[in-house]
Amino acid sequence: MQIADYFTEQDTMGRRRAKQVGVNYGVLRLPERSGFDLTSAEHWNAYLDGFRSDGIIPVVIEPLPNGLYDTVKCGLPGRDEAMYKLKKIVALMGRFHIPTLCLNFMAHVGWYRSRQNYPLRGGALGTAFDIKDYVPADDFAITQEQIWANMESFFREIVPVAEKYQVRLALHPDDPPVPALGNVGRVLTSLQSIDRAVTSWIAPC
């Protein structure tokens, strides 16, 4: 078993604290700032060095950078350029021996909660979701059928690259698992839908 924690570029104190309690592995979020070139091996090496110098071994990238990836999930203009960069990310993961990419296919609206301060036991607070409290931020619309088609196209291109560079693909379910948020469809909301995605487009290990 590998005990890992989730880290961002800014969380330098967090990874040092994690190391002190026995965490040796990291699930990393890639920088999305303008000065970081997602396709540059030099930039990747400098980013990863910060974790390695603290004794954290990168083992997972999660998620794909949303500025690029949502273009693919939603099938927007610029999709082909985004796919080129996403393939480069997978290739760089192979080069730097990061074995797993955790991705999702939540289009336009990602992980969502309607409350950030839901009362739990002992006075603790947690997050919560109630569909009646959801208010769309805009009028963007996409159907489940469109998302399935975009997902199929994405996997058709990304799986061969992942196989070539020996990068495993992990698929995160939609969270919350509801049929739609406003006019934005959700698809990975059940065991059956996840099985459809895995058996249809992801090559067996």
Predicted regions and their residues:
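Hydrophobic faces of well-ordered beta-strands that scaffold small-molecule active sites
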Residues: 1-5, 24-28, 58-63, 101-103, ...
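Catalytic beta/alpha-barrel core
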Residues: 6-7, 198
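Alpha-helical scaffolding within the catalytic cores
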Residues: 9-14, 194
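N-terminal ordered "arm"
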Residues: 12-35
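Structural motif corresponding to the early beta-alpha repeats
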Residues: 29-152, 156, 163-164
